[in-house]
Amino acid sequence: MANVQYYDVILKPVITEKSMADMADKKYTFLVHTDANKTMIKDAVEKMFEGTKVASVNTMNLDGKKKRRGRTAGTTSKTKKAIVQLTADSKEIEIFEGL
């Protein structure tokens, strides 16, 4: 995990009903690199989005889904999800504006 830069940590935002409801409390949900830890996620959010201050980070590992194609069975890749709580005086994240 030595060569992962901050822009490689956050892969994409998670846009669901629950994550949209949490945005009112300044909680934002992202899919992150599977090897990223909480401090790396905090640093990446603060560097990528100017004016944001992270209060806490909650992470969860998600197993891959079972898929079939004919007789062949397999699984999709594992993913990691992070819920980032911003401080009260922090700016909003612009990527979620207008959703």
From Swiss-Prot:
Q: Which GO terms describe its molecular function?
A: rRNA binding; structural constituent of ribosome
Q: Which domain of life is it from?
A: Bacteria
User: What is one Gene Ontology biological process annotated in the Swiss-Prot or TrEMBL record?
Assistant: translation
One GO term describing the cellular component: ribonucleoprotein complex
Q: Write out the similarity annotation.
A: Belongs to the universal ribosomal protein uL23 family.
Q: Which UniProt keywords apply?
A: Ribonucleoprotein, Ribosomal protein, RNA-binding, rRNA-binding
User: Ribonucleoprotein: is it a keyword of this entry?
Assistant: yes
Q: How does it assemble?
A: Part of the 50S ribosomal subunit. Contacts protein L29, and trigger factor when it is bound to the ribosome.
Gene3D superfamilies assigned to the protein according to its UniProt record, in alphabetical order: 3.30.70.330
Protein task: One of the early assembly proteins it binds 23S rRNA. One of the proteins that surrounds the polypeptide exit tunnel on the outside of the ribosome. Forms the main docking site for trigger factor binding to the ribosome.
Name this protein carries in UniProt: Large ribosomal subunit protein uL23
Q: Is Flavoprotein one of the keywords UniProt gives this record?
A: no
